[in-house]
Regions:
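Core segments of transmembrane alpha-helices
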Residues: 57-69, 113-117
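Interfacial helix-start motif at the membrane-water boundary
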Residues: 45-62
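Physicochemical signature of membrane-embedded alpha-helices that form the seven-helix bundle of GPCRs
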Residues: 7, 11-14, 59-62, 84-87, ...
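N-terminal signal-anchor transmembrane alpha helix
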Residues: 7-28
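Small-residue-rich segments of transmembrane alpha-helices in multi-pass membrane proteins
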Residues: 114-126
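Transmembrane helix-loop-helix
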Residues: 69-115
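Helix-coil boundary and interhelical linker segments in multi-pass alpha-helical membrane proteins
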Residues: 1-10, 69-83, 123-126
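Cytosolic, membrane-interface loops and tails of multi-pass inner-membrane proteins
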Residues: 27-49
Length: 126
């Protein structure tokens, strides 16, 4: 594996771990003070949206699993690894781009969510 692919894989791993953390915040800790503060909502808003957040959290977990499995396959030389990792980080970046353009008040979160997947995409394609 080339140095660029290795650094891209590391960025993909970090993006995957970030999405595992997002899963935790959305699916497990949604009504906690930390989650309410992070997502800028009241406890009542969190309680009213916990089913939606639970579902969205699992979406983020599946993106993380897809990406992390892809990187594992890459490191073991399986040809399916790189495309799987690329598709995972492409999905992560696409979601971040959608958030960036559809919700101007959430652009900071979109940049945080999309930077590592974008770095991984660029380096994995080189």
């Amino acid at each position: 594996m080339s140095i660029l692919s290795t650094v891209g894989a590391i960025a993909a791993i970090l993006a995957g771990l970030l999405h595992v953390f997002i899963f935790y915040m959305e699916s497990i800790a949604w009504t906690s003070e930390k989650a309410c503060s992070t997502f800028g909502m009241t406890k009542e808003e969190a309680n009213n949206t916990k089913e939606m957040a639970f579902n969205q959290g699992f979406y983020n977990l599946m993106l993380a699993i897809e990406t992390l499995f892809g990187v594992c396959f890459m490191f073991f030389g399986n040809v399916i690894g790189k495309p799987l990792a690329i598709f995972g980080v492409l999905s992560m970046f696409s979601a971040a781009a959608l958030l960036f353009f559809s919700s101007p008040d959430k652009r900071s979160a979109a940049i945080k969510q999309g930077t590592l997947p974008l770095i991984a995409l660029i380096l994995l394609f080189l």
